[in-house]
Amino acid sequence: MTTKKPSKGGKPSRGQAPNKGAKAGAARTTKPGKPLPGWFPELNEGSAPPRGRKARGADAAAPGPAPGRKLPPAGKVIDDPYAAREAEKYEQPIASREAILALLERCEGPQTAEELGARLGLTAPDRAEALSRRLGAMVRDGQLVQNRRGGFAPIQTLNLVTGVVIANPEGFGFLRPVEGGDDLFLPPYEMRKVMHGDKVLARVTGIDHRGRREGSIARVLERGMTRLIGRFSVEMGINYVVPDDKRVQRNVQVPPDQTGGARDGQLVVCELTQAPDSRRPPIGRIIAVLGDKLTASLVVETAIHGHELPFEFPQEVLDEAASVPLVVEPAMIGDRVDLRSTPLVTIDGEDAKDFDDAVFCEPNAEGFRLVVAIADVSNYVRPGTPLDEEAQKRATSVYFPGFVVPMLPETLSNGICSLMPKVDRMCFVCDMQIDRDGLVTHSRFYEAVMNSHARLTYTQVWKAVGEDDAETQAWMGDLLPHVQRLHQLYKVLSKARAKRGAIEFESSEVRFVLDNRGEVTQAGMLVRNDAHKLIEECMIAANVEAAKYLLSRHVPAPYRIHEKPPETKYADLLEFLKEFKLSLPPWSKVRPGDYTKLLKKIRDRPDATLLESVLLRSQSLAIYSPENHGHFGLALEAYAHFTSPIRRYPDLLVHRAIKHALSGKPLDKFTYNAREMAALALQCSERERRADEAEREVDERYRAAWMEKHVGGQFDGVISGVTSFGLFVELDESKVQGLVHVTQLPQDYYKFDATRKTLTGERRGSSYRLGDRVRILVLKASMEERKIDFRLVEHKGEDEGESLPPLPERGKPAKRKKEKY
């Protein structure tokens, strides 16, 4: 693995050597015995003079006003309530930070250092220099921001954007606003102040040459990364870690006494002890050595460490979990509705262990009665307890092939909370009346006790109702009519879904089978059938009723919102569709049904998978919010997550909110106020994204591990991405994606058309575009780098007899050249 050189900040401090060539005054040194200026300690704040102003020597002329601006009258020097503290601290004190902030808040706009100096009576060269350094320190500490004209303003008085930093391996990044809206572009020099995942305040500085809003970092609110995975390296006596995550652009320097016994080249877990800034790299210490090589057995462990997933439960949490009863005793039931004789069943995957939901359906004069019974986690996990605090911290269970990082200890998630068959369990019920058009006409929520009559799988249900398999039907016995009625209800709900225009994306999830060493032995696509969709529609119905009930009772709760596509993304989508002679309505008029119509139109095309993927990527991200904004994808006016409290904290919050409304207690007696619920909704959204990233990383590594076994093999696929450096190809059967580098195309000079997404040879005229079918040869796969390289073997329309370039030396693909941003 190629390693980066230590970043500049990783070198020994220049302060260790004498500064022989420094000019008088520039280094701010003093002669022996001469007392330091009273403001000299401000230099320890580590800030250079503010941008746009050079340090002046002691004999420099007094600063003047900024060009084109009238200098405000000094008047009376403002009262400084902290003057005594400053006088005690410095021999020649200047205005305190508090006084500077108070003055700026009274000004009509940003003030330059010269204007502030005039107002504060600090116009002498040394006093002006001291003020300049203090202002620089306040900018560094996030108390002030400085605009391009050199004016300073308090952060809270400016229109700043709060968001999360999303880094790009090329060095630049984006700020994803927490309030939604378009991202801010962050150039490389701004990205040196932050790391991927940091929550920051930023200000919009202008529009870049591509028409994107550009921003600068004003203050880091919360560090998003406290540890990372990487290769430990030693170069010229300096220890550092090269991050495995290429979005972390700077190597982490490791002090000699913090190496944890790691050797050069080993894979390690590094805990960050000091954040980076524009001049210094991050500092860290080694907390675990994973080994010399990333093996399949380490893939999940690496993801857990790299994404900082809470893995082990604190002892106090385990102690509380151990005190929870293992069975439901008669005395615990109280006045709960008794559903134990109702033939509720669970329907899940073969490998499921935690059973959140059970369903029952019966026909009646008005249509159908649907009972959705959900594990009553809120009965066991109470607000403010160690169990609740840990569940809140995790916010979601994380699912890897063959392994789960649960939100709750297994004694609850796989035990007393899980709706296992033939045992009594506490549940929280949404009982619905559904008419023959698939609309819920009435619903009610109540606490109950149930006894699942069977643990069914999607495969069993599909065989019984979809394939009419006699053996499966006989095995189900008395439950078969109930399952058939559920399938009848599904057809009704499915028609209602189609009528309202909900988007129907066909999922293509890859499932891996591992042996006891963690090696991938099998990979295949998860096939969704009506059994999956049956449960999905039942859960959606209950989720909608939960959202409606909460809205009617005005109880703070996290809604699951999915807004229409961002306008800029949608504009790009329209341009893309033009190349395929397809279209959608303008952004202001687009509805979910428009997507559905287009998906039906392209379903039989050979490039349908690619087009569907592009349509999916154009969508907004679904998040949790204390305010209901509806769900665009499902074409619903209100939506909340109610059905999975064992594995999702928002569902637990929704249960608590509904129960509070049912109790009839005043709103001000609810555990959470609106502000607290907003903070929890944001945290749950962030934790969900973290889990998704961890699951995606493991998926990518296992895909690469699977393709390592097929190096030299040939496969058919479709071009899923076109760039200036090559083609991305998605294989038909496994959905694995790899790169055909331009060096693995027929020899030519290739021109990339960013608008049409094509790569065209100037001499031969060969053209490659999105959706083209190709045959590739697997050239190389690296589980550690999460990269798969292909070589083009056949392209539809390509002239026969075209010579392909020879393989690069030792079978390695040519080095990818970084594109300028």
Residue spans for each PLM region:
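Charge-lined substrate channels and their catalytic hotspots, especially those that engage the 3′ end
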Residues: 2-371, 378-423, 455, 460-463, ...
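Acidic/polar residues at beta-strand termini and the immediately following turn/coil
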Residues: 147, 177, 243, 435, ...
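A structural feature that tracks compact, well-ordered secondary-structure segments
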Residues: 185, 728-730, 779-781
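A generic structural signal for residues embedded in beta-strands
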Residues: 202, 270, 722, 776-778
